[in-house]
Protein backbone atom coordinates (compact mmCIF):
# COMPACT_ATOMS: atom_id res chain seq x y z
CA UNK A 1 0.00 0.00 0.00
CA UNK A 2 1.60 3.27 -1.22
CA UNK A 3 1.95 6.25 0.98
CA UNK A 4 -0.05 9.37 0.23
CA UNK A 5 1.87 12.62 -0.13
CA UNK A 6 0.91 15.33 2.24
CA UNK A 7 -1.39 18.08 0.92
CA UNK A 8 1.38 20.64 0.86
CA UNK A 9 3.47 18.53 -1.51
CA UNK A 10 0.44 17.91 -3.77
CA UNK A 11 -0.20 21.62 -4.07
CA UNK A 12 3.42 22.27 -5.03
CA UNK A 13 3.20 19.54 -7.68
CA UNK A 14 0.19 21.14 -9.27
CA UNK A 15 1.77 24.55 -9.37
CA UNK A 16 4.82 23.18 -11.20
CA UNK A 17 2.72 21.63 -13.93
CA UNK A 18 0.82 24.84 -14.64
CA UNK A 19 2.05 26.95 -17.62
CA UNK A 20 1.43 30.69 -17.58
CA UNK A 21 1.01 32.68 -20.79
CA UNK A 22 2.91 35.88 -21.23
CA UNK A 23 -0.24 37.79 -22.29
CA UNK A 24 -3.56 37.74 -20.55
CA UNK A 25 -6.62 37.16 -22.68
CA UNK A 26 -10.00 38.67 -22.00
CA UNK A 27 -13.19 36.93 -22.84
CA UNK A 28 -14.82 38.82 -25.78
CA UNK A 29 -18.57 38.65 -25.56
CA UNK A 30 -20.45 40.75 -28.17
CA UNK A 31 -22.83 43.17 -26.59
CA UNK A 32 -26.40 42.76 -27.88
CA UNK A 33 -27.56 45.69 -29.97
CA UNK A 34 -30.70 47.34 -28.84
CA UNK A 35 -33.27 46.70 -31.50
CA UNK A 36 -36.27 48.92 -31.69
CA UNK A 37 -39.45 46.93 -32.02
CA UNK A 38 -41.81 47.94 -34.75
CA UNK A 39 -45.23 48.96 -33.58
CA UNK A 40 -48.09 49.80 -35.88
CA UNK A 41 -48.41 53.39 -34.70
CA UNK A 42 -44.76 54.17 -33.77
CA UNK A 43 -41.71 52.77 -31.97
CA UNK A 44 -41.60 50.15 -29.22
CA UNK A 45 -38.62 49.90 -26.83
CA UNK A 46 -36.57 46.77 -26.09
CA UNK A 47 -38.65 45.93 -23.04
CA UNK A 48 -41.72 45.57 -25.20
CA UNK A 49 -43.35 48.65 -23.73
CA UNK A 50 -45.56 50.56 -26.12
CA UNK A 51 -45.38 54.32 -25.67
CA UNK A 52 -48.52 56.26 -24.96
CA UNK A 53 -50.75 56.96 -27.91
CA UNK A 54 -49.96 60.54 -28.80
CA UNK A 55 -51.48 62.33 -31.76
CA UNK A 56 -48.40 64.53 -32.12
CA UNK A 57 -46.17 61.55 -32.97
CA UNK A 58 -45.55 60.41 -36.51
CA UNK A 59 -45.65 56.79 -37.67
CA UNK A 60 -42.32 54.99 -37.86
CA UNK A 61 -41.79 53.11 -41.09
CA UNK A 62 -38.48 51.60 -42.23
CA UNK A 63 -36.79 53.82 -44.78
CA UNK A 64 -36.16 50.95 -47.17
CA UNK A 65 -39.87 50.13 -47.25
CA UNK A 66 -40.91 53.49 -48.61
CA UNK A 67 -41.71 53.95 -52.25
CA UNK A 68 -42.34 57.47 -53.61
CA UNK A 69 -45.30 56.17 -55.60
CA UNK A 70 -47.00 54.28 -52.78
CA UNK A 71 -49.08 55.61 -49.92
CA UNK A 72 -48.70 53.38 -46.86
CA UNK A 73 -51.66 53.17 -44.57
CA UNK A 74 -51.37 52.32 -40.86
CA UNK A 75 -52.90 48.88 -41.12
CA UNK A 76 -50.70 47.95 -44.11
CA UNK A 77 -53.70 46.81 -46.14
CA UNK A 78 -53.47 48.24 -49.61
CA UNK A 79 -56.50 48.58 -51.82
CA UNK A 80 -56.45 49.37 -55.55
CA UNK A 81 -57.98 52.55 -56.86
CA UNK A 82 -58.81 51.37 -60.31
CA UNK A 83 -62.03 49.50 -59.49
CA UNK A 84 -64.14 52.44 -60.53
CA UNK A 85 -64.63 53.90 -57.08
CA UNK A 86 -63.05 57.23 -57.88
CA UNK A 87 -66.41 58.97 -57.53
CA UNK A 88 -66.03 58.95 -53.76
CA UNK A 89 -63.00 61.23 -53.96
CA UNK A 90 -64.67 64.56 -54.53
CA UNK A 91 -63.28 68.07 -54.67
CA UNK A 92 -63.49 69.40 -51.16
CA UNK A 93 -61.11 70.86 -48.64
CA UNK A 94 -60.89 70.33 -44.93
CA UNK A 95 -60.76 72.94 -42.21
CA UNK A 96 -57.09 73.65 -42.94
CA UNK A 97 -57.79 74.26 -46.64
CA UNK A 98 -55.74 71.23 -47.67
CA UNK A 99 -56.79 69.94 -51.05
CA UNK A 100 -58.44 66.53 -50.80
CA UNK A 101 -59.47 66.04 -54.41
CA UNK A 102 -57.02 63.56 -55.81
CA UNK A 103 -57.12 59.88 -55.02
CA UNK A 104 -53.52 59.45 -56.15
CA UNK A 105 -50.33 59.90 -54.18
CA UNK A 106 -46.87 60.33 -55.58
CA UNK A 107 -45.95 59.91 -59.21
CA UNK A 108 -48.24 57.07 -60.20
CA UNK A 109 -51.67 58.61 -60.71
CA UNK A 110 -53.34 55.28 -61.47
CA UNK A 111 -53.09 53.82 -57.98
CA UNK A 112 -54.15 54.87 -54.54
CA UNK A 113 -54.27 52.85 -51.36
CA UNK A 114 -57.25 53.84 -49.28
CA UNK A 115 -57.78 52.44 -45.83
CA UNK A 116 -58.79 48.85 -45.32
CA UNK A 117 -60.53 47.53 -42.25
CA UNK A 118 -62.19 50.09 -40.06
CA UNK A 119 -59.92 53.11 -40.43
CA UNK A 120 -60.92 56.61 -41.29
CA UNK A 121 -59.51 58.46 -44.25
CA UNK A 122 -56.38 60.61 -44.18
CA UNK A 123 -55.97 63.99 -45.88
CA UNK A 124 -52.18 63.87 -45.65
CA UNK A 125 -49.44 61.54 -46.70
CA UNK A 126 -47.42 60.07 -43.80
CA UNK A 127 -45.31 62.68 -42.07
CA UNK A 128 -42.11 60.64 -42.37
CA UNK A 129 -42.79 59.48 -45.90
CA UNK A 130 -41.13 61.18 -48.87
CA UNK A 131 -44.28 60.52 -50.87
CA UNK A 132 -45.94 63.87 -51.60
CA UNK A 133 -49.66 64.22 -52.02
CA UNK A 134 -50.74 65.16 -55.52
CA UNK A 135 -53.59 67.64 -55.48
CA UNK A 136 -56.26 67.99 -58.12
CA UNK A 137 -54.69 71.23 -59.36
CA UNK A 138 -51.36 69.51 -60.01
CA UNK A 139 -49.69 70.99 -56.93
CA UNK A 140 -47.68 68.81 -54.57
CA UNK A 141 -48.52 69.16 -50.90
CA UNK A 142 -45.80 68.31 -48.41
CA UNK A 143 -46.15 66.40 -45.18
CA UNK A 144 -48.49 68.08 -42.75
CA UNK A 145 -49.30 67.45 -39.13
CA UNK A 146 -50.25 63.80 -38.97
CA UNK A 147 -53.67 62.93 -37.68
CA UNK A 148 -54.44 59.50 -36.32
CA UNK A 149 -57.87 57.97 -36.55
CA UNK A 150 -59.65 56.74 -33.48
CA UNK A 151 -58.76 53.15 -32.60
CA UNK A 152 -61.18 50.52 -33.79
CA UNK A 153 -61.60 48.92 -30.39
CA UNK A 154 -63.00 51.50 -28.04
CA UNK A 155 -62.16 51.60 -24.36
CA UNK A 156 -64.52 50.01 -21.89
CA UNK A 157 -65.03 53.21 -19.95
CA UNK A 158 -66.82 56.37 -21.02
CA UNK A 159 -64.99 58.31 -23.69
CA UNK A 160 -64.08 61.91 -22.97
CA UNK A 161 -62.88 63.98 -25.85
CA UNK A 162 -59.68 65.94 -25.40
CA UNK A 163 -60.21 67.91 -28.59
CA UNK A 164 -61.95 71.22 -27.92
CA UNK A 165 -64.42 72.55 -30.40
CA UNK A 166 -62.82 74.95 -32.85
CA UNK A 167 -65.62 77.43 -32.56
CA UNK A 168 -68.35 77.80 -30.03
CA UNK A 169 -71.12 77.93 -32.55
CA UNK A 170 -74.60 78.48 -31.36
CA UNK A 171 -77.82 77.62 -33.03
CA UNK A 172 -81.09 79.29 -32.29
CA UNK A 173 -83.42 76.58 -31.15
CA UNK A 174 -87.08 76.28 -31.85
CA UNK A 175 -89.03 76.25 -28.62
CA UNK A 176 -91.39 73.58 -29.87
CA UNK A 177 -89.07 71.21 -31.68
CA UNK A 178 -85.52 71.87 -30.61
CA UNK A 179 -85.78 72.88 -26.97
CA UNK A 180 -86.39 69.38 -25.72
CA UNK A 181 -83.71 67.78 -27.86
CA UNK A 182 -81.13 70.37 -26.82
CA UNK A 183 -81.69 69.80 -23.14
CA UNK A 184 -83.54 73.09 -22.59
CA UNK A 185 -86.61 72.96 -20.38
CA UNK A 186 -89.89 73.70 -22.03
CA UNK A 187 -90.99 77.28 -22.00
CA UNK A 188 -87.49 78.66 -22.30
CA UNK A 189 -86.21 80.33 -25.42
CA UNK A 190 -82.60 81.00 -26.28
CA UNK A 191 -79.58 79.30 -27.70
CA UNK A 192 -77.56 76.29 -26.66
CA UNK A 193 -73.94 75.46 -27.50
CA UNK A 194 -73.49 72.72 -30.03
CA UNK A 195 -71.33 69.88 -28.81
CA UNK A 196 -68.93 68.12 -31.16
CA UNK A 197 -69.95 64.68 -32.32
CA UNK A 198 -67.33 62.48 -30.68
CA UNK A 199 -66.56 58.85 -31.19
CA UNK A 200 -69.48 56.55 -30.41
CA UNK A 201 -71.71 59.51 -29.54
CA UNK A 202 -74.22 58.28 -32.04
CA UNK A 203 -77.86 57.93 -31.31
CA UNK A 204 -80.13 57.15 -28.44
CA UNK A 205 -80.66 53.55 -27.44
CA UNK A 206 -79.41 51.89 -30.61
CA UNK A 207 -76.90 52.49 -33.36
CA UNK A 208 -79.03 54.58 -35.70
CA UNK A 209 -82.41 54.73 -34.07
CA UNK A 210 -84.21 56.85 -31.53
CA UNK A 211 -82.54 60.12 -32.48
CA UNK A 212 -79.30 61.70 -31.34
CA UNK A 213 -78.29 62.16 -27.76
CA UNK A 214 -79.26 65.62 -26.64
CA UNK A 215 -77.04 68.44 -27.85
CA UNK A 216 -75.19 66.52 -30.56
CA UNK A 217 -75.15 67.28 -34.22
CA UNK A 218 -76.80 64.76 -36.55
CA UNK A 219 -74.11 63.68 -39.05
CA UNK A 220 -76.76 62.89 -41.63
CA UNK A 221 -77.56 66.59 -41.97
CA UNK A 222 -75.17 69.39 -42.77
CA UNK A 223 -74.98 72.67 -40.98
CA UNK A 224 -77.69 74.27 -43.11
CA UNK A 225 -80.19 71.49 -42.49
CA UNK A 226 -79.83 69.80 -45.86
CA UNK A 227 -79.52 66.03 -45.92
CA UNK A 228 -75.91 65.04 -46.15
CA UNK A 229 -74.62 63.50 -49.40
CA UNK A 230 -72.59 61.03 -47.35
CA UNK A 231 -74.28 57.79 -46.43
CA UNK A 232 -72.98 56.77 -43.02
CA UNK A 233 -74.17 53.18 -43.05
CA UNK A 234 -73.78 50.25 -45.35
CA UNK A 235 -76.53 47.98 -44.13
CA UNK A 236 -80.26 48.33 -44.29
CA UNK A 237 -81.46 51.77 -45.27
CA UNK A 238 -83.92 53.79 -43.29
CA UNK A 239 -86.51 56.00 -44.91
CA UNK A 240 -87.15 58.16 -41.87
CA UNK A 241 -84.83 59.91 -39.46
CA UNK A 242 -86.48 58.45 -36.36
CA UNK A 243 -86.76 54.92 -37.67
CA UNK A 244 -84.47 52.55 -35.81
CA UNK A 245 -82.38 49.79 -37.28
CA UNK A 246 -83.01 46.29 -36.03
CA UNK A 247 -80.14 44.99 -33.94
CA UNK A 248 -78.12 47.69 -32.25
CA UNK A 249 -74.60 47.73 -33.52
CA UNK A 250 -72.94 50.41 -31.45
CA UNK A 251 -74.56 51.90 -28.40
CA UNK A 252 -73.62 55.27 -27.07
CA UNK A 253 -71.30 55.53 -24.10
CA UNK A 254 -72.54 59.00 -23.38
CA UNK A 255 -75.25 59.91 -21.00
CA UNK A 256 -77.95 62.14 -22.33
CA UNK A 257 -78.03 65.72 -21.19
CA UNK A 258 -81.32 65.19 -19.42
CA UNK A 259 -80.57 61.70 -18.12
CA UNK A 260 -78.19 60.86 -15.29
CA UNK A 261 -77.94 57.18 -16.16
CA UNK A 262 -75.16 56.57 -18.68
CA UNK A 263 -75.82 54.25 -21.56
CA UNK A 264 -73.69 51.12 -21.79
CA UNK A 265 -71.93 49.69 -24.77
CA UNK A 266 -73.32 46.70 -26.48
CA UNK A 267 -70.96 43.84 -25.70
CA UNK A 268 -72.45 41.55 -28.31
CA UNK A 269 -70.66 40.90 -31.55
CA UNK A 270 -72.13 42.90 -34.39
CA UNK A 271 -71.30 43.47 -38.02
CA UNK A 272 -71.77 47.19 -37.48
CA UNK A 273 -68.77 47.46 -35.18
CA UNK A 274 -66.79 49.43 -37.74
CA UNK A 275 -69.04 52.42 -37.24
CA UNK A 276 -67.06 53.44 -34.16
CA UNK A 277 -63.99 54.38 -36.13
CA UNK A 278 -65.86 56.61 -38.53
CA UNK A 279 -67.38 59.06 -36.05
CA UNK A 280 -64.99 61.73 -34.94
CA UNK A 281 -65.22 65.22 -33.46
CA UNK A 282 -67.11 67.46 -35.84
CA UNK A 283 -67.60 71.19 -35.69
CA UNK A 284 -70.54 73.14 -36.98
CA UNK A 285 -68.60 74.85 -39.73
CA UNK A 286 -70.13 72.68 -42.43
CA UNK A 287 -69.29 69.39 -44.07
CA UNK A 288 -66.66 70.99 -46.27
CA UNK A 289 -64.75 71.94 -43.12
CA UNK A 290 -65.18 68.88 -40.93
CA UNK A 291 -61.78 67.41 -41.61
CA UNK A 292 -60.64 64.28 -43.30
CA UNK A 293 -63.17 61.68 -42.35
CA UNK A 294 -66.21 62.69 -44.36
CA UNK A 295 -65.41 63.65 -47.95
CA UNK A 296 -62.44 61.48 -48.88
CA UNK A 297 -63.60 58.00 -47.96
CA UNK A 298 -67.08 58.09 -46.47
CA UNK A 299 -68.43 55.00 -44.81
CA UNK A 300 -70.41 54.10 -47.89
CA UNK A 301 -67.13 53.12 -49.55
CA UNK A 302 -66.72 50.25 -47.16
CA UNK A 303 -68.51 46.96 -47.12
CA UNK A 304 -69.75 45.03 -44.12
CA UNK A 305 -66.23 44.36 -42.86
CA UNK A 306 -64.54 47.58 -43.85
CA UNK A 307 -63.22 46.59 -47.26
CA UNK A 308 -63.55 48.87 -50.24
CA UNK A 309 -66.00 46.54 -51.97
CA UNK A 310 -69.35 48.22 -51.66
CA UNK A 311 -72.36 46.22 -50.73
CA UNK A 312 -74.58 46.08 -53.75
CA UNK A 313 -71.71 47.40 -55.90
CA UNK A 314 -73.49 50.74 -56.17
CA UNK A 315 -76.81 49.41 -57.39
CA UNK A 316 -79.81 49.02 -55.16
CA UNK A 317 -80.55 50.52 -51.80
CA UNK A 318 -77.86 48.54 -50.00
CA UNK A 319 -75.09 50.70 -51.42
CA UNK A 320 -76.66 54.08 -50.86
CA UNK A 321 -79.00 55.74 -48.42
CA UNK A 322 -82.69 55.59 -49.24
CA UNK A 323 -82.90 59.35 -49.21
CA UNK A 324 -79.99 59.96 -51.52
CA UNK A 325 -78.95 58.82 -54.92
CA UNK A 326 -75.23 58.08 -54.92
CA UNK A 327 -74.06 61.54 -53.94
CA UNK A 328 -77.62 62.77 -53.44
CA UNK A 329 -77.07 66.45 -54.14
CA UNK A 330 -79.95 68.76 -53.42
CA UNK A 331 -79.93 70.99 -56.48
CA UNK A 332 -81.63 74.33 -56.55
CA UNK A 333 -81.42 74.76 -60.29
CA UNK A 334 -81.96 72.51 -63.27
CA UNK A 335 -78.72 73.07 -65.12
CA UNK A 336 -76.34 70.91 -63.13
CA UNK A 337 -77.55 67.59 -61.85
CA UNK A 338 -75.90 64.48 -60.58
CA UNK A 339 -76.28 61.55 -62.90
CA UNK A 340 -75.81 58.74 -60.43
CA UNK A 341 -77.27 55.29 -60.39
CA UNK A 342 -80.68 54.69 -58.99
CA UNK A 343 -81.77 52.72 -55.98
CA UNK A 344 -84.73 50.58 -55.08
CA UNK A 345 -86.75 53.39 -53.58
CA UNK A 346 -86.66 55.60 -56.65
CA UNK A 347 -86.58 54.69 -60.31
CA UNK A 348 -83.50 56.49 -61.51
CA UNK A 349 -81.48 59.63 -60.93
CA UNK A 350 -83.67 61.08 -58.23
CA UNK A 351 -82.72 63.35 -55.40
CA UNK A 352 -84.27 63.94 -52.00
CA UNK A 353 -87.42 65.44 -53.46
CA UNK A 354 -87.64 62.69 -56.09
CA UNK A 355 -87.85 65.18 -58.95
CA UNK A 356 -84.60 64.58 -60.76
CA UNK A 357 -84.35 62.70 -64.00
CA UNK A 358 -85.90 59.25 -64.17
CA UNK A 359 -84.62 56.78 -66.71
CA UNK A 360 -87.61 54.48 -66.12
CA UNK A 361 -91.01 54.95 -64.57
CA UNK A 362 -93.09 52.80 -62.22
CA UNK A 363 -93.84 50.30 -64.97
CA UNK A 364 -90.24 49.10 -64.70
CA UNK A 365 -91.13 47.58 -61.32
CA UNK A 366 -94.22 45.84 -62.60
CA UNK A 367 -96.66 48.53 -61.47
CA UNK A 368 -98.75 50.75 -63.67
CA UNK A 369 -100.45 54.03 -63.03
CA UNK A 370 -103.83 53.53 -61.41
CA UNK A 371 -105.44 56.37 -63.33
CA UNK A 372 -105.73 56.50 -67.08
CA UNK A 373 -105.27 59.88 -68.72
CA UNK A 374 -107.45 60.67 -71.69
CA UNK A 375 -106.75 63.24 -74.36
CA UNK A 376 -109.56 65.43 -73.01
CA UNK A 377 -107.84 65.66 -69.63
CA UNK A 378 -104.61 66.92 -71.18
CA UNK A 379 -105.41 70.61 -71.37
CA UNK A 380 -103.71 73.33 -73.29
CA UNK A 381 -100.94 75.12 -71.48
CA UNK A 382 -99.54 78.58 -72.06
CA UNK A 383 -95.85 79.31 -71.75
CA UNK A 384 -94.11 82.66 -71.75
CA UNK A 385 -91.44 82.47 -74.44
CA UNK A 386 -89.45 85.61 -75.22
CA UNK A 387 -92.20 87.82 -73.77
CA UNK A 388 -94.76 86.37 -76.16
CA UNK A 389 -97.57 84.05 -75.22
CA UNK A 390 -98.00 80.97 -77.32
CA UNK A 391 -100.61 78.30 -76.89
CA UNK A 392 -99.27 74.78 -77.22
CA UNK A 393 -101.75 72.08 -78.14
CA UNK A 394 -101.35 68.89 -76.14
CA UNK A 395 -102.74 65.72 -77.66
CA UNK A 396 -102.29 62.36 -75.95
CA UNK A 397 -101.67 59.76 -78.66
CA UNK A 398 -103.61 56.55 -78.61
CA UNK A 399 -101.62 53.37 -78.04
CA UNK A 400 -103.11 51.57 -81.04
CA UNK A 401 -102.77 54.63 -83.24
CA UNK A 402 -99.05 54.84 -82.53
CA UNK A 403 -98.35 51.15 -83.00
CA UNK A 404 -100.19 50.63 -86.27
CA UNK A 405 -99.92 47.30 -88.04
CA UNK A 406 -99.71 48.98 -91.44
CA UNK A 407 -96.69 51.08 -90.54
CA UNK A 408 -94.16 50.49 -93.35
CA UNK A 409 -90.80 48.99 -92.53
CA UNK A 410 -89.26 49.18 -96.01
CA UNK A 411 -87.94 52.45 -97.44
CA UNK A 412 -85.83 53.12 -100.50
CA UNK A 413 -84.29 56.11 -98.84
CA UNK A 414 -84.47 57.26 -95.24
CA UNK A 415 -82.29 58.71 -92.51
CA UNK A 416 -82.05 57.31 -89.00
CA UNK A 417 -80.62 58.79 -85.81
CA UNK A 418 -80.31 57.65 -82.21
CA UNK A 419 -81.72 60.05 -79.61
CA UNK A 420 -80.44 59.66 -76.06
CA UNK A 421 -82.59 61.45 -73.51
CA UNK A 422 -81.58 62.21 -69.95
CA UNK A 423 -84.99 61.33 -68.56
CA UNK A 424 -88.36 59.90 -69.46
CA UNK A 425 -89.89 63.15 -68.24
CA UNK A 426 -88.62 64.85 -71.37
CA UNK A 427 -89.87 62.01 -73.57
CA UNK A 428 -93.26 62.34 -71.89
CA UNK A 429 -93.34 66.04 -72.81
CA UNK A 430 -92.20 65.23 -76.33
CA UNK A 431 -95.13 62.84 -76.75
CA UNK A 432 -97.45 65.37 -75.15
CA UNK A 433 -96.41 68.37 -77.25
CA UNK A 434 -95.02 66.62 -80.37
CA UNK A 435 -91.74 68.51 -80.13
CA UNK A 436 -88.11 67.80 -79.30
CA UNK A 437 -84.86 69.67 -78.64
CA UNK A 438 -81.31 68.39 -78.68
CA UNK A 439 -77.93 69.89 -77.86
CA UNK A 440 -76.69 72.77 -80.05
CA UNK A 441 -74.50 70.41 -82.07
CA UNK A 442 -77.26 67.82 -82.19
CA UNK A 443 -79.76 70.36 -83.45
CA UNK A 444 -77.37 71.39 -86.23
CA UNK A 445 -76.81 67.78 -87.21
CA UNK A 446 -80.50 66.93 -87.30
CA UNK A 447 -81.41 70.13 -89.13
CA UNK A 448 -78.79 69.49 -91.81
CA UNK A 449 -80.11 65.95 -92.29
CA UNK A 450 -83.69 67.19 -92.55
CA UNK A 451 -82.77 69.90 -95.08
CA UNK A 452 -80.91 67.34 -97.18
CA UNK A 453 -83.83 64.91 -97.03
CA UNK A 454 -86.26 67.60 -98.18
CA UNK A 455 -84.25 68.20 -101.32
CA UNK A 456 -84.81 64.63 -102.50
CA UNK A 457 -87.80 64.30 -104.80
CA UNK A 458 -88.42 60.64 -104.00
CA UNK A 459 -89.06 61.37 -100.34
CA UNK A 460 -86.70 60.71 -97.48
CA UNK A 461 -88.13 60.59 -93.96
CA UNK A 462 -85.91 61.26 -90.95
CA UNK A 463 -86.60 58.77 -88.15
CA UNK A 464 -85.44 59.05 -84.56
CA UNK A 465 -84.94 56.06 -82.27
CA UNK A 466 -85.50 57.22 -78.68
CA UNK A 467 -83.71 55.77 -75.68
CA UNK A 468 -83.12 57.06 -72.16
CA UNK A 469 -79.64 56.92 -70.70
CA UNK A 470 -79.00 53.91 -68.45
CA UNK A 471 -82.51 52.56 -69.04
CA UNK A 472 -81.43 49.43 -70.89
CA UNK A 473 -84.11 49.83 -73.53
CA UNK A 474 -85.51 51.89 -76.39
CA UNK A 475 -88.91 53.43 -75.88
CA UNK A 476 -90.13 54.58 -79.27
CA UNK A 477 -89.77 55.74 -82.85
CA UNK A 478 -90.59 59.27 -84.04
CA UNK A 479 -90.23 61.18 -87.30
CA UNK A 480 -89.05 64.74 -87.82
CA UNK A 481 -91.85 66.84 -89.31
CA UNK A 482 -90.06 70.15 -89.68
CA UNK A 483 -86.71 71.92 -89.51
CA UNK A 484 -85.07 73.01 -86.29
CA UNK A 485 -86.07 76.45 -85.06
CA UNK A 486 -82.93 77.62 -83.29
CA UNK A 487 -84.64 80.72 -81.90
CA UNK A 488 -87.57 78.90 -80.29
CA UNK A 489 -86.81 77.74 -76.78
CA UNK A 490 -89.23 75.55 -74.86
CA UNK A 491 -89.42 76.03 -71.10
CA UNK A 492 -90.99 72.79 -70.00
CA UNK A 493 -87.95 70.54 -70.35
CA UNK A 494 -86.49 69.05 -67.19
CA UNK A 495 -83.36 71.15 -67.66
CA UNK A 496 -83.07 74.72 -68.84
CA UNK A 497 -80.03 74.24 -71.05
CA UNK A 498 -81.86 72.93 -74.14
CA UNK A 499 -82.16 75.51 -76.90
CA UNK A 500 -84.10 75.36 -80.13
CA UNK A 501 -86.82 72.87 -81.02
CA UNK A 502 -88.40 71.05 -83.92
CA UNK A 503 -91.73 69.27 -84.46
CA UNK A 504 -92.06 65.53 -84.76
CA UNK A 505 -94.63 62.75 -84.93
CA UNK A 506 -94.57 59.55 -82.91
CA UNK A 507 -95.14 56.29 -84.79
CA UNK A 508 -94.15 53.56 -82.30
CA UNK A 509 -94.33 53.64 -78.50
CA UNK A 510 -93.19 50.45 -76.81
CA UNK A 511 -90.39 49.24 -74.55
CA UNK A 512 -87.80 47.40 -76.62
CA UNK A 513 -84.97 45.88 -74.52
CA UNK A 514 -81.40 46.36 -75.68
CA UNK A 515 -80.89 42.61 -75.84
CA UNK A 516 -82.98 42.51 -79.02
CA UNK A 517 -80.77 45.08 -80.75
CA UNK A 518 -77.22 44.30 -79.62
CA UNK A 519 -76.45 42.25 -82.71
CA UNK A 520 -76.87 45.33 -84.93
CA UNK A 521 -73.55 47.17 -85.23
CA UNK A 522 -72.92 50.63 -86.64
CA UNK A 523 -70.14 51.41 -89.09
CA UNK A 524 -70.37 55.10 -88.17
CA UNK A 525 -69.57 54.23 -84.55
CA UNK A 526 -66.54 51.91 -84.83
CA UNK A 527 -68.79 48.87 -85.36
CA UNK A 528 -70.19 49.16 -81.86
CA UNK A 529 -73.69 47.86 -81.12
CA UNK A 530 -76.54 50.21 -81.79
CA UNK A 531 -77.31 50.07 -78.08
CA UNK A 532 -73.94 51.72 -77.37
CA UNK A 533 -74.61 54.96 -79.19
CA UNK A 534 -74.41 58.62 -78.32
CA UNK A 535 -77.03 61.25 -78.88
CA UNK A 536 -77.77 62.03 -82.55
CA UNK A 537 -75.67 59.05 -83.68
CA UNK A 538 -76.51 58.41 -87.33
CA UNK A 539 -77.51 54.91 -88.44
CA UNK A 540 -77.13 53.67 -92.00
CA UNK A 541 -80.15 52.68 -94.04
CA UNK A 542 -79.59 48.92 -93.78
CA UNK A 543 -79.16 48.88 -90.02
CA UNK A 544 -81.92 51.44 -89.55
CA UNK A 545 -84.46 49.28 -91.38
CA UNK A 546 -83.52 46.33 -89.16
CA UNK A 547 -84.18 48.41 -86.06
CA UNK A 548 -87.53 49.59 -87.43
CA UNK A 549 -88.57 46.00 -88.13
CA UNK A 550 -87.66 44.90 -84.60
CA UNK A 551 -89.55 47.86 -83.17
CA UNK A 552 -92.68 46.93 -85.06
CA UNK A 553 -92.59 43.16 -84.54
CA UNK A 554 -91.71 43.22 -80.85
CA UNK A 555 -94.71 42.40 -78.69
CA UNK A 556 -94.16 44.61 -75.67
CA UNK A 557 -96.46 44.54 -72.66
CA UNK A 558 -95.39 47.97 -71.45
CA UNK A 559 -94.72 51.42 -72.87
CA UNK A 560 -94.30 54.93 -71.57
CA UNK A 561 -98.04 55.55 -71.95
CA UNK A 562 -98.54 53.30 -68.92
CA UNK A 563 -96.81 55.95 -66.80
CA UNK A 564 -98.38 58.97 -68.46
CA UNK A 565 -100.47 59.96 -65.43
CA UNK A 566 -97.39 59.50 -63.24
CA UNK A 567 -95.39 61.92 -65.36
CA UNK A 568 -98.32 64.33 -65.54
CA UNK A 569 -98.28 64.60 -61.75
CA UNK A 570 -94.50 64.98 -61.75
CA UNK A 571 -94.67 67.73 -64.36
CA UNK A 572 -97.15 69.66 -62.24
CA UNK A 573 -94.94 69.33 -59.18
CA UNK A 574 -91.83 70.32 -61.10
CA UNK A 575 -93.53 73.41 -62.51
CA UNK A 576 -94.68 74.43 -59.03
CA UNK A 577 -91.18 73.91 -57.68
CA UNK A 578 -89.67 75.95 -60.50
CA UNK A 579 -92.17 78.75 -59.90
CA UNK A 580 -91.24 78.86 -56.22
CA UNK A 581 -87.55 78.94 -57.08
CA UNK A 582 -88.06 81.77 -59.53
CA UNK A 583 -90.10 83.68 -56.96
CA UNK A 584 -87.41 83.16 -54.35
CA UNK A 585 -84.68 84.28 -56.73
CA UNK A 586 -86.76 87.30 -57.64
CA UNK A 587 -87.13 88.27 -54.00
CA UNK A 588 -83.41 87.86 -53.43
CA UNK A 589 -82.63 89.96 -56.49
CA UNK A 590 -85.07 92.66 -55.43
CA UNK A 591 -83.47 92.69 -51.99
CA UNK A 592 -80.03 93.15 -53.54
CA UNK A 593 -81.36 95.91 -55.77
CA UNK A 594 -82.80 97.76 -52.79
CA UNK A 595 -79.51 97.45 -50.92
CA UNK A 596 -77.60 98.88 -53.86
CA UNK A 597 -79.79 101.96 -54.23
CA UNK A 598 -77.99 105.31 -53.77
CA UNK A 599 -78.24 106.77 -50.32
CA UNK A 600 -78.16 103.48 -48.45
CA UNK A 601 -75.54 103.13 -45.77
CA UNK A 602 -73.88 99.84 -45.03
CA UNK A 603 -74.43 99.03 -41.37
CA UNK A 604 -71.20 97.07 -41.18
CA UNK A 605 -69.07 100.14 -41.96
Curated annotation (Swiss-Prot):
The keyword Cytoplasm applies. InterPro entries: YTH_domain (IPR007275), YTH_prot (IPR045168). Residues 249-274, 357-384, 580-605 are annotated as: Disordered. It comes from the Eukaryota. Residues 414-551 form the YTH domain. Disruption phenotype: No visible phenotype under normal growth conditions, but the delayed leaf emergence and leaf morphology defect of the double mutant ect2 and ect3 is enhanced in the triple mutant ect2, ect3 and ect4. GO terms for molecular function: RNA binding. The keyword Membrane does not apply. Residues 368-383 have a biased composition (Basic and acidic residues). Expressed in the shoot apex, at the sites of leaf formation, and in emerging leaves. It is found in: Cytoplasm. Pfam families: YTH. CDD domains: YTH. Residues 256-274 have a biased composition (Polar residues). RNA binds at residues 420-422, 426, 436-437, 469, 493, 498, 506. Keywords: Cytoplasm, RNA-binding. Specifically recognizes and binds N6-methyladenosine (m6A)-containing RNAs, and regulates mRNA stability. M6A is a modification present at internal sites of mRNAs and some non-coding RNAs and plays a role in mRNA stability and processing. Required for the correct timing of leaf formation and normal leaf morphology. This is YTH domain-containing protein ECT4. It comes from Arabidopsis thaliana. The gene is ECT4.
Amino acid sequence: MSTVAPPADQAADVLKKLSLDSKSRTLEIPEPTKKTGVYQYGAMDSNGQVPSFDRSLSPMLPSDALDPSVFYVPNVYQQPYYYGYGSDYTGYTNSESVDMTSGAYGENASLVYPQGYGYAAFPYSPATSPAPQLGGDGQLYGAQQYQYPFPLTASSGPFASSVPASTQSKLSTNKAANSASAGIPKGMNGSAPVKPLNQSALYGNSALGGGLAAGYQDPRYSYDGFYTPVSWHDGSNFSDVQRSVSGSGVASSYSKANNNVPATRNQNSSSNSHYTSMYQPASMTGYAAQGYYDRVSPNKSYGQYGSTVRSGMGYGSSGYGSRTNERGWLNTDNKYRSRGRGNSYFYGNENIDGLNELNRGPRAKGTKATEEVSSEEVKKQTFDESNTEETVTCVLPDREECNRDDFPVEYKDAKFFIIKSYSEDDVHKSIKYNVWASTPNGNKKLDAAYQEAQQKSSGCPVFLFFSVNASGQFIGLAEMKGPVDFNKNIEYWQQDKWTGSFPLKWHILKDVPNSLLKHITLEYNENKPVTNSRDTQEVKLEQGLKVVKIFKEHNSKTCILDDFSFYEARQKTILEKKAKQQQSQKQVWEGKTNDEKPGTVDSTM
